[in-house]
Regions:
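Basic nucleic-acid-binding interfaces
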Residues: 1-20, 28-58
Length: 58
């Protein structure tokens, strides 16, 4: 999955960018308080993308 597509999905679920790390961007779901890093790679493996989406859902 492309990184920009994953970020679009995460932001459409109501998550916000918390901070820019050295190699990852951290997104948080404000309703649950869960934070999850998203790596800065053009391509993100499908299994990792599914895990990130699962963790940041409501």
């Amino acid at each position: 999955m492309k990184r920009r597509d994953l970020i679009r999905l995460v932001e459409n679920n109501g998550c916000i960018l918390v901070r820019h790390g050295a190699r990852h961007d951290w997104y948080q779901n404000p309703q649950t308080g869960v934070c999850q890093p998203i790596p800065r790679h053009r391509e993100i493996k499908e299994a990792l993308a599914k895990h990130i989406i699962k963790m940041l859902k409501d």
